[in-house]
Amino acid sequence: ALVLLAFQVQADPIQNTDEETKTEEQPGEDDQAVSVSFGDPEGSSLQEESLRDLVCYCRTRGCKRRERMNGTCRKGHLMHTLCCR
């Protein structure tokens, strides 16, 4: 399912008020948070539960600690790494 995600990701800045992210390095010009969409408007409850707290970034230089690579994403016409935690 996450491989499918790589082709459907659209860049969309997201603000996170989580205390953990305040102490970590914030996304800069090279990193953008993205929203995740699977195309099925109804979705499945299992899918919704597992993705509820998923935060992904489209990164140009690879994933940071506590993130894992979940595919690729686009910024304009360039492909980058999709990193989620």
Curated annotation (Swiss-Prot):
Broad class of the protein's primary localization: secreted
Gene Ontology biological process: defense response to bacterium
Stretch list, region Disordered: 13-48
Prodomain positions: 12-50
Signal peptide annotation: 1-11
Cellular component terms (Gene Ontology): extracellular space
InterPro entries associated with the record: Alpha-defensin (IPR016327), Alpha-defensin_C (IPR006081), Alpha-defensin_N (IPR002366), Beta/alpha-defensin_C (IPR006080)
Positions of disulphide bridges: 56-84, 58-73, 63-83
Keywords associated with the record: Antibiotic, Antimicrobial, Defensin, Disulfide bond, Secreted, Signal
Tissue expression profile of the protein: Paneth cells of the small bowel.
Subcellular location: Secreted
Superkingdom: Eukaryota
Family named by the database record: Belongs to the alpha-defensin family.
Entry function: Probably contributes to the antimicrobial barrier function of the small bowel mucosa.
Protein known as: Alpha-defensin 14
Source organism phylogeny: Eukaryota, Metazoa, Chordata, Craniata, Vertebrata
